[in-house]
Amino acid sequence: CENFSADITRLDYQLQGADLPKQGIRGEGSLKARWEDLNKRLSISNLNLKANESSLRGGLAVVLNDKPTWQLDLTSDNLNLDTLLVRAPLADENGEDAQTAQAAVLPRPVISGSGELPAWSVLNSSDGSATLQFANLRWRGLAFTNVDARMVNKNGQLSVERLRGDLGAGRISLPGSVDASGTPVHAVFKPEVSNIEIASILKAFDYPLAVSGSLSMNGEFSGDSIDAQAFRRSWQGKASVEMANSRLEGMNFQQLVQRAVTRNNNDVQAQQDYDDATVMAHFSASATL
């Protein structure tokens, strides 16, 4: 049996590739690594990594048995995914942009002769857990703070015990599970949203609706694929929704009603200086997807 340790005090790197941002990824880092031959265990500790505008600290351990078992623990003061990941455009409801979105995803290396492995195959091929804490996280233009996540995978069943963070004056929690032990994959999430500005969410996912206001929501949704297109087309679920101080641009319902009344009654005078928007102090509804 042989054990060895390595202390890497400085590592400079630069990455370029089809699946990376145009400017690439560059940075520096340091870490300690240890291999225990008897236990087939590789551990990385004191990880300190910088990448573009982001930084990561923490460690990783993996036991390389027939079915690897891993443990990941990462923290960050600032993680900007918008400078680390390629953002593909979202297709519209009619699928007119689907070919454009597909073309934006450049080809990846082929894995064996059967093509690329299924997206969730890693959940069946290994077990593990991950704890993530990010003071500042930027994704699709959304600036999250105090992000805290805890995930555990066992035999193809991923439990998202915690996935929460602050966004502006509000808070989002997204616990759930992904069962990849069978076919098709089945995912269930129970979002809890409190006092989130809806305009920023709509903008992040390229929705053209001109709506603003404070959104709160509790619900449960399920589907067989985790992406924006699948959520629009095939996910199902229910939620209770509340909005405060909401504003819908381009349509004034009160003005529409008054115009309808004045057309049928010449004695009624409609106000002419309405803003071209509908404003509601409070709105609540039950929604089904």
PLM feature spans:
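A structural feature that tracks compact, well-ordered secondary-structure segments
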Residues: 47, 59-61
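Beta-strand-rich interaction surfaces with strong enrichment in secreted/lumenal proteins
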Residues: 45-46, 206-208
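Flexible beta-edge/linker motif
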Residues: 62, 67-84, 229-231
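Solvent-exposed beta-strand/coil patches in large extracellular/periplasmic or lumenal scaffold regions
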Residues: 2-4, 11-49, 96-192, 214-289
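Outer-membrane beta-barrel proteins
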Residues: 10-11, 81-85, 198-202, 248-252
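Conserved catalytic/acceptor-binding region of the Class I
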Residues: 211
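Terminal amphipathic helices with adjacent charged low-complexity linkers/tails
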Residues: 88-94
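Internal alpha-helical scaffold/solenoid segments in large eukaryotic proteins
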Residues: 51-54
